[in-house]
Amino acid sequence: MKSAVENLTPTRVKLNVEVPFEELKPSIDEAYKTVASQIQVPGFRKGKVPAKLIDQRVGRGYVLETAINEGLNGWYQEAVQETGIRPLSRPEVEITEVPDPTATDGELKFHAEVDVRPEIELPDYSGIKVEVAAAESSEADVDKALDELRGRFGTLKSVDRPAADGDFLTIDITASIDGAEVDSASGLSYQVGAGTMLEGLDEAVTGLSADEDAIFDTTLVGGDHAGEAAQVKVVVKSVKERELPEADDDFAQLASEFDTLAELREDLAKQAAESKVVEQGVEARDKVLDKLVELVEVPVPASVVEEQLEQHFKAENSHGDGEHDTEEHRAEVKANTERAFQNEIILDAIADKEEVGVSQNELIDYIVTTASQYGMDPNQFAQIIDQSGQVPMMVSEVRRRKALAVVLGQAEVTDSEGNKVDLSDFVRPGGEEEAAEAEAAPAVDSDAVEGEAATEEAAPSDDPAAVKF
């Protein structure tokens, strides 16, 4: 078999393949067996019909067509291996020549157009310089953390006053379009200022007391009338404020392992300082990635991006989030997908250059960490990703994290005050970023984790938009 690559664009090639008759013949022999098992001829058992009789009954041309259909993918895969291309999408195949059905020689010729991973030239990435914010925590950070902790132990208390920011309300709402009621809901709980329901709701309820109402104009975001302008009436049924426990030694004993408030504040101060270091590491990681993308031109195949977009919005629609399929949101998702693809290509190239590997223990650690993010048993999670074919994707993800850790380890990072930043607490000895576990979205299809069937990708490695740094 002969195969040759014709470059169409930096991300698309045409694979020209020629299969000689001697390599086509085994497929023809198998095709005769297939056809023999499909037809019935008096005097012959099923599957035992002679080839000459098959030619008379269905024609040798049909047998040849069957042989080509059954063997085409194998010849394509062989050509991919021979040429070393790395496909990202399913090929568009066109058969240009077939042997004469009446002859015993000739060639099968076809070409396949397919998107491929672009080849890039890596720059010198040692000593990349970035500046990050100073990792300084303050008493205000401790106070904020303490208030958040008190909030977890707070109680709601009814108040006889107008609603204010942060209050908790029970409300009834009714939506009307052109004077006709289209939707309503009663007994909804809502925190003033949350901004999680309807645009304009916070302004409408602020200043209302129990049993008072207001009418405001807004755009509906769910249901049959999503995206339509409507007039909404909101009735406040109750107003409650959160009553926080006193910050004292008793609270420290209730909410923590410490006996005194001073000890609790000391621990919160330590956590705040560690959090600032993690934030600093995340900022350094993101800025190093930004620098790499600036230094390397990575062409992005449009068809791959479009496929990812369709998969994204198909998943959103299946979960009832179709109202978010707007032009603005599509542009945002498209930009994020393109950037994620560029990150993947660059980090894969660095991993190749640095000969980065992934040990079984590193993969297990990553699976355990990701499982905890989903609140799942690691063994159950591992079984799900194995059944959905996502293990190679996770291996690639760990490998990219290690590649990024290599670059981070060589980067020159200073804070806004000119101090050199030590990332040793952020980058693990094994190469995986400490903060990436919490900050980066897991490169696992959440639909598969929830038990839905994962879509099998044509790419030889993994989903090109899966890396979410």
From Swiss-Prot:
GO terms for molecular function: peptidyl-prolyl cis-trans isomerase activity; protein folding chaperone; ribosome binding. The keyword Cell cycle applies. GO terms for biological process: 'de novo' cotranslational protein folding; cell division; chaperone-mediated protein folding; protein transport; protein unfolding. It catalyses: [protein]-peptidylproline (omega=180) = [protein]-peptidylproline (omega=0). Residues 166-245 form the PPIase FKBP-type domain. Keywords: Cell cycle, Cell division, Chaperone, Cytoplasm, Isomerase, Rotamase. Its EC number is 5.2.1.8. Residues 430-469 are annotated as: Disordered. GO terms for cellular component: cytoplasm. Transmembrane segments: none annotated. InterPro entries: PPIase_dom_sf (IPR046357), PPIase_FKBP_dom (IPR001179), Trig_fac (IPR005215), Trigger_fac_C (IPR008880), Trigger_fac_C_sf (IPR037041), Trigger_fac_ribosome-bd_bac (IPR008881), Trigger_fac_ribosome-bd_sf (IPR036611), Trigger_fact/SurA_dom_sf (IPR027304). Its main location: cytoplasm. It is found in: Cytoplasm. Involved in protein export. Acts as a chaperone by maintaining the newly synthesized protein in an open conformation. Functions as a peptidyl-prolyl cis-trans isomerase. Belongs to the FKBP-type PPIase family. Tig subfamily. HAMAP family: Trigger_factor_Tig. Consists of 3 domains; the N-terminus binds the ribosome, the middle domain has PPIase activity, while the C-terminus has intrinsic chaperone activity on its own. This is Trigger factor. It comes from Arthrobacter sp. (strain FB24).
